[in-house]
Amino acid sequence: MSAIERSTEILGGQTSLAKLLGVSQSHVWNWINRKHQAPAKYIRAISEATRGEVSVKELLTDHEDTN
């Protein structure tokens, strides 16, 4: 499971994460199902929203795994 998927589960779903970040649920769906990573500009906010349960390092690893 990718870090972005874990983040979504922790926060209660794609819609919840999208609202926290000010994006649409479809953006989050694309990150999970097409890109398998969150855009870099959201990584710190996602980690903070999960209260560190998903670290910045884990979210960055998603980027490394797809390159």
Walk through the language-model features, giving the residues of each.
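Short glycine/proline-centered loop/turn elements that form peptide/ligand docking sites
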Residues: 12
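Short amphipathic helical patch at the helix-1/turn junction of helix-turn-helix
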Residues: 8-9
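Short, charged recognition helix plus adjacent turn
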Residues: 2-5, 15, 19, 25-26, ...
